[in-house]
Amino acid sequence: MNTELFGVISIFIVSIVLAIPLGRYIAKIYSNDKTLLDPIFNPIEKFIFKISGINATEVMNWKQHLKALLSINMVWFFLCFFILLFQGSLFLNPDNNPSMPPDLAFNTAISFLVNCNLQHYSGESGVSYLSQLFLMFLQFVSAGVGMAAAAMVFTAMKERTTDKLGNFYNFFIKSCTRILLPLSVIVAVALLFSGTPMTFEGKDTITTLQGDTVEISRGPAAAFIAIKHIGTNGGGFFGANSAHPLENPTYFTNAVELWAQLIIPFAMIFALGFYLKKRKFSYVIFGVMTVGFLLLVIPTVISELNGNPAIERMGITQATGAMEGKEVRFGPAVTGFWSIATTVISTGSVNSMHDSSMPVSGSMELLAMMINAFYGGCGVGILNFYIFIILAVFISGLMVGRTPEFLGKKIEAREVKIAAFIAILHPLLILSGTALASYFAANDTAMGYWFSGNATGWLNNPGHHGFSEMLYEYTSSAANNGSGFEGLADNNPFWNITTGIVLLLSRFLPIIGPLAIAGLLANKKYIPESAGTLKTDTTIFGVMVFAVIAIIAALSFFPALALGPLAEYFTLK
């Protein structure tokens, strides 16, 4: 156990140490400062802009940024949707996998577009290699879009008055070419040399020791898995995701994949400090996020190491902890750490079955996605936290009787209304979706087109855990996470379409909100800092932000958690 805990702590510390220089590098990229890699990437980027006809030097306001962002996403959604819809008739399909039905193609295209990768299919039999390649490219697009949006907000937070906030396409292309692609190559090579396949050949047939023949799925997995973690996307090449022995063969690859999903969310926080030349401010943000992360991960690891009390009452020793649904090559400690890292960061990849997690662990996984403000995904993590900063500044200003100010700009009614709407949107989508599904399940409604049979048919685990499965599905969708309690039968029109709608609303509205707030604040008159200015780089302000997150984000979900994982916890006692 001590060795397992040492491995977990080492991965976390190494990720933080490496994130600081990466954050400095990212800040230089978005500031258009010179870097050592300019001779390599400048010609590539010039070529991309030339063939696309984009003027990367044109300066945009926040509305133009938003228009460019939505346009890119719309184009790639329709292209990917039609490829999935007709993949059975297209090339690069050596295993003859069939085309997707429209509802599943709709859900899958949206899911990869919005950095969620919910995956209501199994990669071995659900998609062709051509579709996998397009989905892999969407993982670059979704991560690059989030980082470009964050870069615009960084620019707006500088100490001046302007509506010129850089160029979206410049931020987007540089995020992909200079950050996502190099890191993905490093991770892909590490996976390739550790046994992860990288081929366009179809299934391989092997003979087992018992003399049976078995078909083994393979494909261009190493490249797909690399960007899935670097871009905090989380979609697995194989159905079992990173629990699959070819997707995550060893403890070393497990450590690499964990580091890969931590590094950019950490680095973006430090990049903000370097970009604004306010490093202490970024340390406060990182400190708040880390405290929140530790409050989630410590109970999870302890719960998994202690095992299942129901099994203990049977007199069975659980020396290795709660091993149901886990891989022996990883163990419960690093698996518990991964489960919180992947839900806090919004990656959504899994190296175990979350449906088999202990109730305390399941509640922490849910709470991580419900809060959706600690670290977060590529770019959008800092945007989610930005909303809570605005609310904390507003509340702090009211408490001391001053007009709220943030980085020299007055926070007024319009900004607060936008921030409040975005903060309320997350629980609204999760709880309303869960209420709808629960209503149908409780009444055993005949679903017709929406589901083959009555609504209780999508629950393999009735009772408290069945409710948790439905709650988890909508929470994962709203947090753009993509992991799931896979006891839920979710590949049907009801779940594909309802979660698809939640995916769209929960991705783009929380991006539009921070962009609008940042754009409005950037246009306001800059007020120099004075003795009465609220300091945002202090521990007191960090505590205030944490309190706002706890009250607005966490407490909103307590009744739902009480009906699901908390009730299940007490039934095991």
Curated annotation (Swiss-Prot):
Keywords, comma-separated and alphabetical: Cell inner membrane, Cell membrane, Ion transport, Membrane, Potassium, Potassium transport, Transmembrane, Transmembrane helix, Transport
This protein's record includes keyword Transmembrane helix: yes
Pfam families from the UniProt entry: KdpA
Keyword DNA-binding on entry: no
Bilayer topology annotation: Multi-pass membrane protein
A GO CC term attached to the entry: plasma membrane
HAMAP family reported for this sequence: KdpA
Subunit structure: The system is composed of three essential subunits: KdpA, KdpB and KdpC.
Membership in a protein family: Belongs to the KdpA family.
Job of this protein: Part of the high-affinity ATP-driven potassium transport (or Kdp) system, which catalyzes the hydrolysis of ATP coupled with the electrogenic transport of potassium into the cytoplasm. This subunit binds the periplasmic potassium ions and delivers the ions to the membrane domain of KdpB through an intramembrane tunnel.
Protein name per its UniProtKB record: Potassium-transporting ATPase potassium-binding subunit
Protein source organism: Flavobacterium psychrophilum (strain ATCC 49511 / DSM 21280 / CIP 103535 / JIP02/86)
Gene field: kdpA
